[in-house]
Every structure is written in structure tokens, then in C-alpha cells.
Amino acid sequence: MSSIKWKSKDAASCIIIPSELDHKYSRGTLGVITGSAQYPGAAVLTTSAATATGLGALRFHSSSGLAHLVLHQSPEVLVQPGPVTAWLAGSGINSKRFSDITTWLRHRWFVLLDRQSVPTLLDAGALHLAGSLEQPTLITPHSGELSKLLAQRGVIASAELIESNPSEWAMKASELLAVTVLLKGSKTVVAQDQYLIELPVATPWLATAGSGDVLAGIIGALMATNYIEILNDSKRLADVAATGAFIHNRAALIASNGAPISASSIISAIPKAIGKILA
């Protein structure tokens, strides 16, 4: 199985630089359904990471007072429904559909994913939708989540087995579910049909709470700005996912400089990471 080793020049090709003719809506709008009463920080981290990555606008679909938290951190976020060019759904949402009223309210928004059929990222509590949407779809599980997702389709593979050969299992999941798969781990891989991308080994400091939410926000923003390219090129979604992971690791390295980091510090380093990639 051949693969592509993702490099800075590859990532640069997926970062859309605005022209003097662009305005906020021409640059792409990301619709975000993340966070819950149990994990309110996911709403803040995903939206903050997306806005730091650069896009025209972001629409946050709220419940349970999450809008207040998001707007306090990112007042530029829109909190009313409207047209979007990509979706990010599931981060910080319980996978058990109706475990509490907040989870029910978050899942209620998922019906919009079908109504606006644009490139969609499914994470955490939205992974169960993998394979059910017609639009280009990316899932971003870690090995444990992928193990559960495969088991629901009758394929038994432990998290440990998946971690022993992430490339093989990401490819199998992509074929089984007919989606693009970004399998998170120290060795992150992206698979789409027979197309496989391997990312550089990530800094171990990325093993911190909320870093996956930051990754989802970065990729979501890139999907929103690349939506035309994704719809016109079957491999573009995989390239965009790999670019998001590449930016994520670069930002973590900048934030860390050999020391511990938090998810929030990764977000602060995103613009500098993108600048270095484009330099």
C-alpha cells in the first residue's frame, strides 16, 4: 500500500488565501454543532480554533446557554441559523442520543446536516451518522471510537489492534463507510478509498484534553474555505483533512517549544503556524 507523506508544501496548497475581491460570505461559512452541558468547553475550543484558522463566517447552533460562552470568547461568531458551506458536528456531544435534555437538543440540530448538503465533518457524538449522508463526509475518530463504529457495522477490531496498523484500519473504515477517515493518534493517517496520507509523528504534548476539539475546528474552517474544491475534486477532502492535522501539529510545536501546552495555547499559535507554512 503506497502512501503520501504530507509536507509543508502540500499543506500550503490547501490554504485558500483571500483576494481583494473576497468578502465574508465568499470566503466560506462554517456551521458548527458542538458542545453540551457535560462538555461546554468543546463549543468554545472548536469555534475559537476555526476562527483562528481563517474563514469568512461561522454560525454556531446553540443550546443550553452555550452561545454565551462562545460569544464571550469569540464575539464575531454568528448564533442564528443560515446558509453554510461546510458543517462541523459532534465534538463534545454524548454519543448516547438522549442521555439528557442537553444531548437531545444538540442531536436535534443534526437534521440540518441533510438539509444543507455541504461537506461535513463528523466527530465524537456525531460519528454514528457516518455513511448516512450523501455529501462528502469526513470522520475524525481515535482508535477507541473507530473500534466502536466498526463493531456497529459487524467488524470486530479492538483499539489496540487498530493502533498496531492505523493505515490499514483507516483504509478499511473508509471503504466500509464510504467516507474519508482521519484516524487520530501519535501517527495520524487520512484515508479515502485507496488514497492514503501519513502525517509526521505529532509532538507528545498534544496528548491533552481538548486538543481533538481544536483539530476539528481547524479542519472545519479549511473545509468551509475549500468547499468548491472539495465538491470538484474527489481527493480534496482528504488533502484538507491532512492539512488541518499538519497545522494542528505545527501550532502545538510553536506553543510548546519543548514545554507543556493546553488546547487553548494551541489555538493562539494557529495563525503563526499557518504563516510559517505559507512563507
Q: Which residues make up each language-model segment?
A:
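Small-residue (G/A/S/T)-rich helix-start motifs and N-terminal tracts that mark the onset
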Residues: 1-121, 128-135, 148-279
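Non-cysteine beta-strand/loop elements that form the S-adenosyl-L-methionine
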Residues: 136-144
